[in-house]
Every structure is written in C-alpha cells, then in structure tokens.
Amino acid sequence: MVLFHGLEGSSRSHYAEAFAAYARQQEHSYVVPHFRGCSGELNRGPRAYHSGDFEEIGWILSRLRERHKGPILAIGISLGGNALLRWAEEMGGQASRFVSALASVSAPLDLAASGRAIGRGFNRQVYTRMFLASMKPKALEKLAQYPGLFDLRAMQAAIDLYDFDNVFTAPLHGFRNTEDYWERASALPQLRSIRLPTLLVNARNDPFVPAAILPDQQRVGEYISLWQPDQGGHVGFARGAPPGELSCLPEAVGAWLLAQR
C-alpha cells in the first residue's frame, strides 16, 4: 500500500498513521512518500508540489513498481487524492501496469470550488491561516535557494490560498495564474478517463469540498465507485465519542482495495 498525503501533510498525519496501523494488522507493506518539502527537509529544485502533481506521482509509482513485484494499492488523501486521480487520468489504460487499484479520500475534485470554500468564514479564519503559516516559511527558504524566483512582497502579502497560488504555486509549476492552475489541475472534468478500479470517498459535509460539485455515477464511468456518506468531514470519518476513533476509514477503504487485487 502506498499513501499520498494532503496539503502540508506527512507520514505523521493522523490519517497516515491510521492507515499504517491497518496495514500492520493486515501484514501488508506500507509506504508514505513525501511531497517535496513535506519531510522536514527542503528539496533542492526550484519548485514545490501542487494538487495536480501527476508527474511526481508517476515517478514515485514507477520506482515502486521496479522494486515491488506484487500488487500495489494506491491511496490519495485530499491534495494527494486529486493528484493521484490526475495521474490515473493521464495514464488511462496504462495505469494498471503500475497499480492494481486506487482510492481517493476527500479530494478537492474542483479546485476552484474548494478554493472558494476554504477562503470563506470559519475556514478562512482557521484553516487558511494554518496553511499559510506553514507554506510561507517554506517559500522563503525556497527564495533563499533561488533569489528572484518569485515576488517576495506579493507572497508575504498573500491572505488566502488564491493569493499564494497566484504568486508561488502557479508560476513555479508551469501555470499562468491561479485560475489556470485550478482549472488544469482539477481531477473532476476528466474522471471518465480513468481505466482501473477506483474508489472516490467524499463526505457530503466536507467543509472544503462542497457537496454540490460531487459527481454522480453517470459522470464518472464504470471504473469508479462512489462513496459519499452524509457525515465524515474532511478526512475525518471518526466513530465513537469525540475525538473519535480513526480506524473506520482505513478499514473501509482498505477492504475495498484488497478486494480489487
């Protein structure tokens, strides 16, 4: 099992550790690759990572395929889920050469819709601030590596993800601006291109992914199974009294993936 983490996540994220516990229980090998800059070590290139980073996903899966001859089951969480779906869309029928099945959990399938949701109300006051507090210092470290890489003042003035993506994420990764990035990196428009067993998990009360944009079965095609529970939040799916027990998600997703081998 290989898990691709979410925005500013890591192998220490609660969901990564919950899936690790499930993999140990099932006696399966398990790996969490870190997107660039998320391991605690600054990457060396003039770039970071983004929601449509399918080339990075492909490079990692190719290396895993070279080293592991058995089935590979891929899981993507939030940003990692969207990027994993974009990889499967780009690969089409070739994706099954690398993985047997994949699951996406709480992926922001429509980045513009999620960007608007994160930029409003409580989300803006809490989550936007949290993300920027993590990403801005990394951007400064990147600028120290590559002077002139982006507009320092504009980055420091960014008050939401739209602003940050416009000055940092988009130009560093080949996009014209935030709109171009969000449009081209969103997995939603091309889901019917996927040609291997895929599970899309999205809670209908996810504060980052509006229920109105979630696809129905007709839109996604025959290779994709949808699980859209009323509750679950954003990568929550806890059971029991708060703060809840987190094994529900890996048990459900893991069982589905193992059945596809």
Which residues does each PLM region occupy?
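Catalytic nucleophile-loop/oxyanion-hole region of alpha/beta-hydrolase
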Residues: R36-L73
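Active-site nucleophile elbow and catalytic-triad environment of alpha/beta-hydrolase enzymes
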Residues: V167-Q190
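Short beta-strand/loop motif that positions the catalytic acidic residue
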Residues: I194, L200-N202, D206
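Conserved loop-alpha-helix segment in the C-terminal half of the alpha/beta-hydrolase fold
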Residues: R204-S225, P229
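Catalytic histidine-centered segment of alpha/beta-hydrolase-like enzymes
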Residues: G232-S247
